[in-house]
Curated annotation (Swiss-Prot):
Keywords: Apoptosis, Cell cycle, Cell division, Chromatin regulator, Cytoplasm, DNA damage, DNA repair, Mitosis, Nucleus, Repeat, Ubl conjugation pathway. It is found in: Cytoplasm; Nucleus. GO terms for biological process: apoptotic process; cell division; chromatin organization; double-strand break repair; mitotic G2 DNA damage checkpoint signaling; positive regulation of DNA repair; response to ionizing radiation. Component of the ARISC complex, at least composed of uimc1/rap80, abraxas1, brcc3/brcc36, BABAM2 and babam1/nba1. Component of the BRCA1-A complex, at least composed of bard1, uimc1/rap80, abraxas1, brcc3/brcc36, BABAM2 and babam1/nba1. In the BRCA1-A complex, interacts directly with abraxas1, brcc3/brcc36 and babam1/nba1. Binds polyubiquitin. Component of the BRISC complex, at least composed of abraxas2, brcc3/brcc36, babam2 and babam1/nba1. GO terms for cellular component: BRCA1-A complex; BRISC complex; cytoplasm; nucleus. InterPro entries: BRE. Belongs to the BABAM2 family. Residues 33-150 are annotated as: UEV-like 1. Coiled coil: none annotated. This is BRISC and BRCA1-A complex member 2. Contains 2 ubiquitin-conjugating enzyme family-like (UEV-like) regions. These regions lack the critical Cys residues required for ubiquitination but retain the ability to bind ubiquitin. Component of the BRCA1-A complex, a complex that specifically recognizes 'Lys-63'-linked ubiquitinated histones H2A and H2AX at DNA lesion sites. The BRCA1-A complex also possesses deubiquitinase activity that specifically removes 'Lys-63'-linked ubiquitin on histones H2A and H2AX. In the BRCA1-A complex, it acts as an adapter that bridges the interaction between babam1/nba1 and the rest of the complex, thereby being required for the complex integrity. Component of the BRISC complex, a multiprotein complex that specifically cleaves 'Lys-63'-linked ubiquitin in various substrates. Residues 278-367 are annotated as: UEV-like 2.
Length: 386
Protein backbone atom coordinates (compact mmCIF):
# COMPACT_ATOMS: atom_id res chain seq x y z
CA UNK A 1 0.00 0.00 0.00
CA UNK A 2 1.48 3.33 -1.02
CA UNK A 3 0.36 6.08 1.34
CA UNK A 4 0.38 9.51 -0.29
CA UNK A 5 -0.63 12.94 0.92
CA UNK A 6 -4.05 13.97 -0.42
CA UNK A 7 -2.59 16.64 -2.69
CA UNK A 8 0.06 14.34 -4.14
CA UNK A 9 -2.54 11.65 -4.74
CA UNK A 10 -4.78 14.14 -6.54
CA UNK A 11 -1.91 15.24 -8.77
CA UNK A 12 -1.64 11.69 -10.13
CA UNK A 13 -5.33 11.32 -10.92
CA UNK A 14 -6.55 11.81 -14.46
CA UNK A 15 -7.60 15.50 -14.77
CA UNK A 16 -11.14 14.58 -15.86
CA UNK A 17 -11.63 12.54 -12.67
CA UNK A 18 -9.82 14.85 -10.29
CA UNK A 19 -12.88 16.91 -9.16
CA UNK A 20 -14.60 13.70 -8.02
CA UNK A 21 -11.55 12.70 -5.99
CA UNK A 22 -11.14 16.21 -4.54
CA UNK A 23 -14.51 15.84 -2.87
CA UNK A 24 -13.46 12.46 -1.46
CA UNK A 25 -10.11 13.46 0.07
CA UNK A 26 -11.05 16.98 1.19
CA UNK A 27 -14.64 16.53 2.38
CA UNK A 28 -14.75 12.79 2.88
CA UNK A 29 -16.20 12.27 6.33
CA UNK A 30 -18.66 9.41 6.47
CA UNK A 31 -20.30 7.41 9.21
CA UNK A 32 -20.17 7.96 12.95
CA UNK A 33 -16.45 8.64 13.32
CA UNK A 34 -16.26 12.17 11.99
CA UNK A 35 -12.60 12.49 13.02
CA UNK A 36 -11.52 9.94 10.39
CA UNK A 37 -11.46 10.86 6.72
CA UNK A 38 -11.69 8.75 3.63
CA UNK A 39 -8.25 7.95 2.21
CA UNK A 40 -7.10 6.76 -1.19
CA UNK A 41 -4.08 4.53 -1.83
CA UNK A 42 -2.76 2.17 -4.48
CA UNK A 43 -3.26 4.55 -7.39
CA UNK A 44 -3.02 2.75 -10.73
CA UNK A 45 -3.82 3.36 -14.35
CA UNK A 46 -5.68 1.23 -16.84
CA UNK A 47 -4.33 3.33 -19.70
CA UNK A 48 -1.44 2.52 -21.99
CA UNK A 49 1.94 4.02 -21.17
CA UNK A 50 1.58 6.20 -24.27
CA UNK A 51 -1.20 8.26 -22.74
CA UNK A 52 0.29 11.64 -21.78
CA UNK A 53 0.07 13.32 -18.36
CA UNK A 54 -1.31 11.93 -15.10
CA UNK A 55 -3.74 9.15 -15.91
CA UNK A 56 -4.44 7.16 -12.74
CA UNK A 57 -8.06 6.06 -12.84
CA UNK A 58 -8.30 3.33 -10.19
CA UNK A 59 -7.46 3.26 -6.51
CA UNK A 60 -8.25 1.71 -3.17
CA UNK A 61 -10.64 3.68 -0.93
CA UNK A 62 -10.18 3.31 2.85
CA UNK A 63 -13.46 3.80 4.71
CA UNK A 64 -13.78 3.97 8.51
CA UNK A 65 -16.74 1.88 9.60
CA UNK A 66 -17.65 0.40 13.00
CA UNK A 67 -14.05 0.49 14.16
CA UNK A 68 -12.85 -1.30 11.04
CA UNK A 69 -11.33 0.07 7.85
CA UNK A 70 -13.13 -1.11 4.74
CA UNK A 71 -10.98 -1.25 1.62
CA UNK A 72 -12.91 -0.94 -1.59
CA UNK A 73 -11.34 -0.82 -5.05
CA UNK A 74 -12.85 1.86 -7.28
CA UNK A 75 -12.19 1.57 -11.00
CA UNK A 76 -12.84 4.34 -13.51
CA UNK A 77 -11.97 4.46 -17.19
CA UNK A 78 -9.84 7.53 -17.90
CA UNK A 79 -10.51 7.13 -21.63
CA UNK A 80 -14.24 7.42 -20.98
CA UNK A 81 -14.45 9.46 -17.76
CA UNK A 82 -18.20 10.07 -18.02
CA UNK A 83 -18.92 6.44 -17.15
CA UNK A 84 -19.64 5.54 -13.50
CA UNK A 85 -16.99 3.50 -11.68
CA UNK A 86 -16.92 -0.19 -10.90
CA UNK A 87 -16.50 -1.32 -7.28
CA UNK A 88 -14.75 -4.33 -5.77
CA UNK A 89 -15.60 -4.79 -2.09
CA UNK A 90 -12.48 -6.51 -0.85
CA UNK A 91 -13.16 -9.26 1.69
CA UNK A 92 -16.92 -8.73 1.42
CA UNK A 93 -17.24 -10.49 -1.91
CA UNK A 94 -20.85 -11.46 -1.14
CA UNK A 95 -21.89 -7.83 -0.61
CA UNK A 96 -23.96 -7.00 -3.68
CA UNK A 97 -25.58 -3.55 -3.52
CA UNK A 98 -28.93 -3.07 -5.22
CA UNK A 99 -28.16 -0.62 -8.09
CA UNK A 100 -31.74 0.69 -8.28
CA UNK A 101 -31.40 1.95 -4.68
CA UNK A 102 -28.30 4.00 -5.49
CA UNK A 103 -29.67 7.28 -6.93
CA UNK A 104 -26.23 8.69 -7.65
CA UNK A 105 -25.36 5.60 -9.65
CA UNK A 106 -28.66 5.51 -11.53
CA UNK A 107 -28.27 9.22 -12.38
CA UNK A 108 -24.48 9.31 -12.48
CA UNK A 109 -23.18 12.79 -13.32
CA UNK A 110 -19.40 12.95 -13.70
CA UNK A 111 -19.68 16.74 -13.87
CA UNK A 112 -20.98 16.91 -10.29
CA UNK A 113 -17.88 16.89 -8.02
CA UNK A 114 -19.68 15.37 -5.03
CA UNK A 115 -21.29 12.56 -7.05
CA UNK A 116 -18.73 9.91 -6.08
CA UNK A 117 -18.81 10.85 -2.39
CA UNK A 118 -22.61 10.68 -2.37
CA UNK A 119 -22.50 7.30 -4.11
CA UNK A 120 -20.07 5.96 -1.48
CA UNK A 121 -22.42 7.14 1.28
CA UNK A 122 -25.37 5.41 -0.40
CA UNK A 123 -23.36 2.20 -0.69
CA UNK A 124 -22.43 2.43 2.99
CA UNK A 125 -26.12 2.55 3.87
CA UNK A 126 -26.62 -0.72 2.00
CA UNK A 127 -23.44 -2.11 3.54
CA UNK A 128 -24.87 -1.40 6.99
CA UNK A 129 -28.00 -3.39 6.10
CA UNK A 130 -25.79 -6.18 4.76
CA UNK A 131 -23.93 -6.37 8.09
CA UNK A 132 -27.20 -6.32 10.03
CA UNK A 133 -28.44 -9.27 7.99
CA UNK A 134 -25.32 -11.20 8.98
CA UNK A 135 -26.34 -10.89 12.63
CA UNK A 136 -29.07 -13.44 11.89
CA UNK A 137 -26.39 -16.10 12.32
CA UNK A 138 -26.61 -15.38 16.06
CA UNK A 139 -29.97 -15.05 17.82
CA UNK A 140 -28.30 -13.42 20.83
CA UNK A 141 -26.57 -10.71 18.79
CA UNK A 142 -29.69 -10.18 16.71
CA UNK A 143 -31.58 -9.58 19.97
CA UNK A 144 -28.98 -6.98 20.99
CA UNK A 145 -29.38 -5.22 17.65
CA UNK A 146 -33.20 -5.29 17.61
CA UNK A 147 -33.35 -3.94 21.18
CA UNK A 148 -31.17 -0.97 20.28
CA UNK A 149 -33.00 -0.40 17.02
CA UNK A 150 -36.28 0.14 18.88
CA UNK A 151 -34.76 2.96 20.94
CA UNK A 152 -34.63 6.21 18.90
CA UNK A 153 -31.61 7.37 20.93
CA UNK A 154 -29.46 4.59 19.51
CA UNK A 155 -31.13 2.99 16.50
CA UNK A 156 -30.27 5.84 14.10
CA UNK A 157 -26.67 6.19 15.24
CA UNK A 158 -25.27 2.69 15.12
CA UNK A 159 -22.80 0.79 12.93
CA UNK A 160 -22.44 -2.99 12.94
CA UNK A 161 -19.58 -5.15 11.77
CA UNK A 162 -20.56 -8.81 12.02
CA UNK A 163 -19.60 -12.32 11.09
CA UNK A 164 -15.86 -12.29 11.73
CA UNK A 165 -14.70 -15.81 12.53
CA UNK A 166 -12.30 -16.55 15.36
CA UNK A 167 -9.51 -18.53 13.69
CA UNK A 168 -9.09 -20.74 16.78
CA UNK A 169 -12.67 -21.50 17.77
CA UNK A 170 -14.63 -20.72 14.60
CA UNK A 171 -16.95 -18.55 16.70
CA UNK A 172 -19.12 -15.85 15.22
CA UNK A 173 -18.34 -12.37 16.54
CA UNK A 174 -19.45 -8.80 16.00
CA UNK A 175 -18.79 -5.20 16.92
CA UNK A 176 -21.37 -2.51 17.67
CA UNK A 177 -20.33 1.14 17.36
CA UNK A 178 -22.79 3.64 18.81
CA UNK A 179 -22.83 7.41 18.89
CA UNK A 180 -23.90 8.31 22.42
CA UNK A 181 -26.64 10.97 22.76
CA UNK A 182 -24.69 13.19 25.17
CA UNK A 183 -24.99 16.99 24.98
CA UNK A 184 -21.57 18.69 24.93
CA UNK A 185 -22.82 22.12 23.83
CA UNK A 186 -22.59 23.75 27.26
CA UNK A 187 -18.98 22.82 27.97
CA UNK A 188 -17.08 26.12 28.50
CA UNK A 189 -15.41 27.10 25.25
CA UNK A 190 -12.04 27.75 26.89
CA UNK A 191 -11.72 24.02 27.57
CA UNK A 192 -11.97 23.37 23.83
CA UNK A 193 -9.62 26.12 22.65
CA UNK A 194 -6.48 23.97 22.55
CA UNK A 195 -8.09 21.66 20.02
CA UNK A 196 -9.07 24.25 17.42
CA UNK A 197 -7.65 22.02 14.71
CA UNK A 198 -9.69 19.03 15.88
CA UNK A 199 -11.53 17.65 12.83
CA UNK A 200 -15.19 16.82 12.94
CA UNK A 201 -17.87 17.34 15.54
CA UNK A 202 -17.67 16.78 19.29
CA UNK A 203 -18.72 13.19 19.72
CA UNK A 204 -18.59 10.18 22.04
CA UNK A 205 -18.52 6.73 20.47
CA UNK A 206 -18.98 3.48 22.35
CA UNK A 207 -17.50 0.38 20.75
CA UNK A 208 -18.69 -2.98 22.10
CA UNK A 209 -17.04 -6.12 20.73
CA UNK A 210 -18.71 -9.50 21.14
CA UNK A 211 -16.04 -12.15 20.71
CA UNK A 212 -18.51 -15.03 20.58
CA UNK A 213 -22.11 -15.54 19.60
CA UNK A 214 -23.34 -16.13 23.16
CA UNK A 215 -21.86 -12.88 24.53
CA UNK A 216 -19.63 -14.55 27.11
CA UNK A 217 -16.70 -12.32 26.11
CA UNK A 218 -17.70 -8.68 25.66
CA UNK A 219 -15.24 -5.79 25.51
CA UNK A 220 -16.51 -2.19 25.60
CA UNK A 221 -14.36 0.84 24.84
CA UNK A 222 -15.23 4.54 24.85
CA UNK A 223 -13.81 6.92 22.24
CA UNK A 224 -14.07 10.69 22.71
CA UNK A 225 -13.22 13.32 20.12
CA UNK A 226 -9.96 15.09 21.12
CA UNK A 227 -11.68 18.30 22.21
CA UNK A 228 -14.07 16.45 24.54
CA UNK A 229 -11.32 14.26 25.96
CA UNK A 230 -9.32 17.42 26.70
CA UNK A 231 -12.33 19.15 28.28
CA UNK A 232 -13.03 16.23 30.60
CA UNK A 233 -9.48 16.07 31.90
CA UNK A 234 -7.71 13.65 29.56
CA UNK A 235 -8.01 10.00 28.64
CA UNK A 236 -7.51 8.80 32.23
CA UNK A 237 -10.39 10.89 33.62
CA UNK A 238 -13.20 8.58 32.56
CA UNK A 239 -13.37 4.85 33.18
CA UNK A 240 -16.44 3.02 31.95
CA UNK A 241 -17.70 -0.08 33.79
CA UNK A 242 -17.01 -3.55 32.49
CA UNK A 243 -19.83 -5.18 30.55
CA UNK A 244 -21.75 -7.24 33.14
CA UNK A 245 -21.94 -11.00 32.82
CA UNK A 246 -25.31 -11.82 31.29
CA UNK A 247 -25.95 -8.14 30.60
CA UNK A 248 -27.56 -6.55 27.54
CA UNK A 249 -26.56 -3.54 25.48
CA UNK A 250 -29.94 -1.87 25.95
CA UNK A 251 -29.21 -1.77 29.71
CA UNK A 252 -25.47 -1.12 29.52
CA UNK A 253 -25.38 1.72 26.98
CA UNK A 254 -27.67 4.07 29.00
CA UNK A 255 -25.40 3.52 32.02
CA UNK A 256 -22.38 4.70 30.04
CA UNK A 257 -24.40 7.65 28.70
CA UNK A 258 -25.38 8.66 32.23
CA UNK A 259 -21.80 8.33 33.46
CA UNK A 260 -20.56 10.58 30.67
CA UNK A 261 -23.43 13.05 31.13
CA UNK A 262 -22.59 13.31 34.83
CA UNK A 263 -18.96 13.98 33.98
CA UNK A 264 -19.95 16.76 31.59
CA UNK A 265 -22.23 18.28 34.22
CA UNK A 266 -19.41 18.20 36.78
CA UNK A 267 -17.21 20.16 34.37
CA UNK A 268 -19.93 22.72 33.62
CA UNK A 269 -20.81 23.06 37.30
CA UNK A 270 -17.12 23.39 38.18
CA UNK A 271 -16.72 26.31 35.79
CA UNK A 272 -19.62 28.25 37.31
CA UNK A 273 -18.58 27.39 40.87
CA UNK A 274 -15.00 28.53 40.23
CA UNK A 275 -16.29 31.81 38.86
CA UNK A 276 -18.42 32.26 41.99
CA UNK A 277 -15.43 31.36 44.19
CA UNK A 278 -13.12 33.91 42.58
CA UNK A 279 -15.82 36.61 42.68
CA UNK A 280 -16.13 36.03 46.43
CA UNK A 281 -12.36 36.30 46.90
CA UNK A 282 -12.32 39.55 44.93
CA UNK A 283 -14.98 40.86 47.30
CA UNK A 284 -13.27 39.68 50.50
CA UNK A 285 -9.65 40.48 49.63
CA UNK A 286 -10.08 43.50 47.34
CA UNK A 287 -6.71 45.08 46.56
CA UNK A 288 -4.97 42.00 47.91
CA UNK A 289 -5.79 40.16 44.68
CA UNK A 290 -2.67 40.30 42.48
CA UNK A 291 -4.05 38.34 39.50
CA UNK A 292 -6.59 35.71 38.58
CA UNK A 293 -7.62 33.63 35.60
CA UNK A 294 -10.52 35.55 34.07
CA UNK A 295 -11.21 32.89 31.41
CA UNK A 296 -11.35 29.51 33.11
CA UNK A 297 -11.25 30.78 36.71
CA UNK A 298 -8.63 28.17 37.61
CA UNK A 299 -6.03 30.32 39.41
CA UNK A 300 -5.93 33.19 41.89
CA UNK A 301 -2.96 34.93 43.56
CA UNK A 302 -3.20 37.07 46.71
CA UNK A 303 -0.60 39.38 48.26
CA UNK A 304 -1.23 39.55 52.01
CA UNK A 305 0.55 40.89 55.08
CA UNK A 306 0.63 39.69 58.69
CA UNK A 307 2.58 41.73 61.28
CA UNK A 308 4.82 43.30 58.62
CA UNK A 309 5.40 39.88 57.00
CA UNK A 310 4.31 39.90 53.36
CA UNK A 311 3.51 36.70 51.54
CA UNK A 312 1.70 35.36 48.49
CA UNK A 313 -1.08 32.79 48.42
CA UNK A 314 -1.60 30.96 45.12
CA UNK A 315 -4.97 29.22 44.82
CA UNK A 316 -5.34 26.47 42.19
CA UNK A 317 -8.90 25.37 41.49
CA UNK A 318 -9.25 21.87 39.96
CA UNK A 319 -11.37 20.95 36.96
CA UNK A 320 -13.86 19.09 39.14
CA UNK A 321 -14.24 21.84 41.74
CA UNK A 322 -16.06 21.97 44.17
CA UNK A 323 -15.97 18.18 44.47
CA UNK A 324 -12.16 18.37 44.51
CA UNK A 325 -10.56 20.77 46.99
CA UNK A 326 -8.45 23.75 45.82
CA UNK A 327 -4.70 23.67 46.50
CA UNK A 328 -3.19 26.57 48.48
CA UNK A 329 0.48 27.48 48.02
CA UNK A 330 1.92 29.94 50.55
CA UNK A 331 5.02 31.74 49.30
CA UNK A 332 7.34 34.14 51.10
CA UNK A 333 8.45 37.18 49.12
CA UNK A 334 11.69 37.41 51.15
CA UNK A 335 13.07 33.91 51.63
CA UNK A 336 14.72 31.64 49.09
CA UNK A 337 15.47 27.92 49.08
CA UNK A 338 18.95 26.55 48.40
CA UNK A 339 17.95 26.15 44.75
CA UNK A 340 17.11 29.85 44.43
CA UNK A 341 13.32 29.47 44.47
CA UNK A 342 11.04 31.48 46.74
CA UNK A 343 10.31 29.49 49.89
CA UNK A 344 6.82 28.00 49.78
CA UNK A 345 4.53 25.47 51.45
CA UNK A 346 1.65 23.64 49.77
CA UNK A 347 -1.55 22.98 51.70
CA UNK A 348 -4.07 20.49 50.36
CA UNK A 349 -5.85 19.71 53.61
CA UNK A 350 -7.65 22.51 55.43
CA UNK A 351 -11.24 23.24 56.52
CA UNK A 352 -13.36 22.80 53.40
CA UNK A 353 -16.75 21.56 52.25
CA UNK A 354 -17.94 21.32 48.64
CA UNK A 355 -21.40 22.31 49.91
CA UNK A 356 -20.28 25.82 50.92
CA UNK A 357 -21.04 28.67 48.56
CA UNK A 358 -18.26 30.94 47.31
CA UNK A 359 -18.79 33.53 50.03
CA UNK A 360 -18.51 30.94 52.80
CA UNK A 361 -15.37 29.49 51.21
CA UNK A 362 -13.74 32.93 51.11
CA UNK A 363 -14.62 33.58 54.77
CA UNK A 364 -13.28 30.18 55.85
CA UNK A 365 -10.11 30.68 53.78
CA UNK A 366 -9.45 34.06 55.41
CA UNK A 367 -9.79 32.48 58.86
CA UNK A 368 -7.46 29.65 57.86
CA UNK A 369 -4.85 32.09 56.54
CA UNK A 370 -4.76 33.84 59.91
CA UNK A 371 -4.30 30.58 61.78
CA UNK A 372 -1.64 29.18 59.44
CA UNK A 373 0.55 32.24 58.85
CA UNK A 374 2.52 32.08 62.15
CA UNK A 375 3.51 28.50 61.30
CA UNK A 376 4.41 29.45 57.72
CA UNK A 377 6.44 32.47 58.83
CA UNK A 378 8.37 30.34 61.29
CA UNK A 379 9.14 27.81 58.56
CA UNK A 380 10.26 30.55 56.17
CA UNK A 381 12.72 32.01 58.70
CA UNK A 382 13.98 28.57 59.73
CA UNK A 383 14.41 27.01 56.28
CA UNK A 384 14.73 29.92 53.85
CA UNK A 385 17.49 32.38 53.11
CA UNK A 386 17.03 36.13 52.78
Amino acid sequence: MNSLSPELALSRISPELRPLLCSIVRNGRVGLDSSSCLRITDLKSGCTSLMPGPCCDRFKLHIPYAGETLKWDIIFNARDPELPPDFIFGEDADFLPEPSELPNLVSWDSGKPECLLLLVKEMLQQYHQYQCQRLRDSSRLLFEYDSLLEDPNYGRNMEIYAGRKNSWTGEFSARFLLKLPVDFSNIPIYLLKDTALDPGEDVALLSVSFEDAEATQVFPKLYLSPSIEHALGGSSALHIPAFPSGGCLIDYVPQVCQLLTNKVQYVIQGYHKRREYIAAFLSHFGMGVVEYDAVGFTKLTLLLMWKDFCFLVHVDLPLYFPRDQPTLTFQSIYHFTSSGQLYSQVQKSYPYSPRWDGNEMAKRAKAYFKSFIPQFQEGAFANGKL
